[in-house]
């Protein structure tokens, strides 16, 4: 039997369920965006290999598009999340994007770059949000660059962590550890 909550979510989603444009029909990456991301990655530290920065940027944009097609993104992020949670779409929650982006870029075996993950905990009306971060090898995630394809519904957002004013990012392991501690105390 369908719960009231899922019925209400479905009712809210139906009017906009077919409003979006399929990702394969959207315009591609804006001119200069790959180069801008490559420059942002390279600017993290002097020893970042320019070829690796360029390759990482190119892959990040291409993989965002591939995931948007795979996840069947046609809606804004929160509408898509509702569809995933209702079983209408296969994947596409923010942590799916972060996990898949991290896995893809880690597969490159970069020598001067590495991936990490961060979470912005929900406060007030906001929900938790996860993202992938690319950093210079051995550096702290706070000096890295946010790679967030979820935020704009299958269009890659990127910015240095310190310049991303929309979210307060914390290392994923710190947030998950804090939650585990809270469960232990409550449990």
Where are each of the predicted segments found?
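Secondary-structure boundary elements
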Residues: 36-82
């Amino acid at each position: 039997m369908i719960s009231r909550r899922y019925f209400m979510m479905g009712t809210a989603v139906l009017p906009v369920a077919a409003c979006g444009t399929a990702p394969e029909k959207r315009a591609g990456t804006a001119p200069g965006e790959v180069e801008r991301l490559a420059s942002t990655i390279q600017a993290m530290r002097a020893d970042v290999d320019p070829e690796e920065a360029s390759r990482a940027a190119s892959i990040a944009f291409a993989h965002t598009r591939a995931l948007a097609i795979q996840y069947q993104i046609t809606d804004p992020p929160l509408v898509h999340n509702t569809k995933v949670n209702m079983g209408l779409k296969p994947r596409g929650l923010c942590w799916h994007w972060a996990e898949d982006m991290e896995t893809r870029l880690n597969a490159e075996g970069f020598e001067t770059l590495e991936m990490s993950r961060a979470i912005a905990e929900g406060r007030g009306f906001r929900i938790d949000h996860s993202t992938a971060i690319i950093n210079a090898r051995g550096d702290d995630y706070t000096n890295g660059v946010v790679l967030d394809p979820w935020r704009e519904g299958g269009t890659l957002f990127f910015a240095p962590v310190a310049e991303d004013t929309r979210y307060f990012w914390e290392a994923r392991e710190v947030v998950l550890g804090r939650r585990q501690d809270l469960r232990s105390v409550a449990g």
